[in-house]
Amino acid sequence: MSQTLQALADGLPADAFAVLGPKLLADGRRQVRVLAPGAEAMGLIDPRGKLLARMQASAIDGVFEGTLAVDGPYRLRIVWPDRVQEVEDPYAFAATLDESLLLQIAAGDGQALRRALGAQHLHCGDVPGVRFALWAPHAQRVAVVGDFNGWDVRRHPMRQRIGGFWELFLPRVDAGARYKYAVTAADGRVLLKADPVARQTELPPATASVVPSAATFAWTDAAWMANRDPAAVPGPLSIYEVHAASWRRDGHNQPLDWPTLAEQLIPYVQQLGFTHIELLPITEHPFGGSWGYQPLGLYAPTARHGSPDGFAQFVDACHRAGIGVILDWVSAHFPDDAHGLAQFDGAALYEHADPREGMHRDWNTLIYNYGRPEVTAYLLGSALEWIEHYHLDGLRVDAVASMLYRDYGRAEGEWVPNAHGGRENLEAVAFLRQLNRDIATQFPGVLTIAEESTAWPGVTAAISDGGLGFTHKWNMGWMHDTLGYMQRDPAERAHHHSQLTFGLVYAFDERFVLPLSHDEVVHGTGGLLGQMPGDDWRRFANLRAYLALMWAHPGDKLLFMGAEFGQWADWNHDQSLDWHLLDGARHRGMQQLVGDLNAALRRTPALYRGTHRAEGFDWSVADDARNSVLAFVRHDPDGGAPLLAVSNLTPQPHHDYHVGVPRAGLWREILNTDSAHYGGSNLGNSGRLATEPVGMHGHAQRLRLTLPPLATIYLQAEK
């Protein structure tokens, strides 16, 4: 026993519960031992504060011993040099983690992990406290350290459970207390690690975890949540992609907190008519320059914007305003910061040991080991935490292509084939299917959007049909082709017309989102406006035409912040958008156009009901490369009015341009990007146009149109 006590006093591996706390003596009394290095004196008291026994310092430094003659609960009265502390003895409590939960985690159950691990408020009997729990199977010893014990690694060694799990209930730990785990590796190194399942963190660059509030947030979005019905007719989906730390900043160039973002961002998004906000990763991340894409706290909103409750308030306010919230979520890799997941218990745990499997050379990050059920439980639990705890409406899963292929970014000989000799990461495939299965089963109606840049088949196909089960996939091919086309001088566009039309070859193979994202406005490219050719007038006209073409094209929409008013410069994550540009009429016109595009999308079923179905689209003009004109019809599968979109992507206007349409009668121009309202030359088709009974472009009727320069127009059939 003395050896065990000495080991504990030295901070070495030993079974604390074997020697600390109350032990029954042969005569019926209880002997109590407490490890409290630095304490000057100690006593045992009853719950009302009455002294039951004085404790004596033993020969082992920091160990106190005392005997209780009576049965019943006791507390410790510890005299420290600067204060007196009265608290229950953590080593008087039995284990609180249900073994069945631990077995479920070991089988890959994310919900079980959410319930078991991290800093969880609970009562043992009538004693409030926090249970700390983690997974560290290679560790010899784990202790919890924090504000409540002076960060002394000797004070609170944890109880080891089956499967490499550790737990300790600490009475009366307050919300807001900072903590970490002191993990003793097999080789004796002591590693100070943040809690992988922390629900709150310190503000970076500080790295401690924080005990969250015990209070339950009072949501007011019941109506929104009840209406999130996957069986309902699909509505429009138009996403405003936001980096919360740089959308707008305060007077000291600091990120806005969640209440301020709610006050400013939500009305702005409402005004522009977007249906959803997609947040670049707000999971806690040590390096702001990663934009959140190198996270370590997959269960905690970053402290850069305030508390977790502040984020819940933001989501609640979005829902009250009729706006959904999507989180950019990173399950592909993690950074190797010393306080994080890398070598968490002194060995490769969350990552692969072999760098050919475990390291992303492109990003100098580590790859999750999707073959370990506890690791997939950790990732699944994170996804479910954001959806259930924060009422999120979707996850955009980052870098899916890097997960699917073992040779992603690797030369021959730098990767390990799968069990069948192939390049596919079969464990990652299984994980992604489980992710989508869990979300669809437990939270029907929640979106899962894959950023997948290859031609992997069936990303949005049903799992039962061999697919991955995502609800949507980013259409990176469409973005690269069309943006590349628009960056060309109009004089060259005739030779590259297929860049506009090729996307329709595969437009209905997946449920696509058309993304003009943050990736298109960084690394010296300038903003979308700055990437357009020509003088200022032509740049604005090109971008207006491009955005209207995008909004009419099959697929849901995503636009990164700043593009809606024509930011010239690269996006800078360390400063606000250039809001002063809205002093200029053309920038205001661009912003008004985006609002009008979203309004047209919302009120025109032909633009969204058939957006993922081939019967929702017909070409009228696909091959007029010489004039850089294309025209197509969008159909409402439920029989609503069709819409004709026509783009003229040269500065040359066309008069009396004939386009075939599917319905006889009157057609009305409902949007024209060359309108003077948007800063254009105001050429167009005022009023209503009557069809002529002349067959053209596979349709029985035709229209005679005026096509303004560098513009897109929408015309809708009238009843």
Swiss-Prot record:
Active site per UniProt: 398, 451
Entry superkingdom: Bacteria
UniProt keyword list: Carbohydrate metabolism, Glycogen biosynthesis, Glycogen metabolism, Glycosyltransferase, Transferase
One Gene Ontology cellular component: cytosol
GO molecular function: 1,4-alpha-glucan branching enzyme activity; cation binding; hydrolase activity, hydrolyzing O-glycosyl compounds
Pathway field: Glycan biosynthesis; glycogen biosynthesis
The UniProt record lists the keyword Transferase: yes
Reactions catalysed according to its record: Transfers a segment of a (1->4)-alpha-D-glucan chain to a primary hydroxy group in a similar glucan chain
Any single GO BP term: glycogen biosynthetic process
CDD domains: AmyAc_Glg_BE (cd11322), E_set_GBE_prok_N (cd02855)
Keyword Transferase: yes
EC number(s) given by UniProt: 2.4.1.18
Quaternary structure, from the entry: Monomer.
Cross-referenced PANTHER family: 1,4-ALPHA-GLUCAN-BRANCHING ENZYME
Protein function: Catalyzes the formation of the alpha-1,6-glucosidic linkages in glycogen by scission of a 1,4-alpha-linked oligosaccharide from growing alpha-1,4-glucan chains and the subsequent attachment of the oligosaccharide to the alpha-1,6 position.
Annotated family: Belongs to the glycosyl hydrolase 13 family. GlgB subfamily.
Name used for this protein in its record: 1,4-alpha-glucan branching enzyme GlgB 2
Organism, scientific name: Xanthomonas axonopodis pv. citri (strain 306)
Lineage of origin: Bacteria, Pseudomonadati, Pseudomonadota, Gammaproteobacteria, Lysobacterales
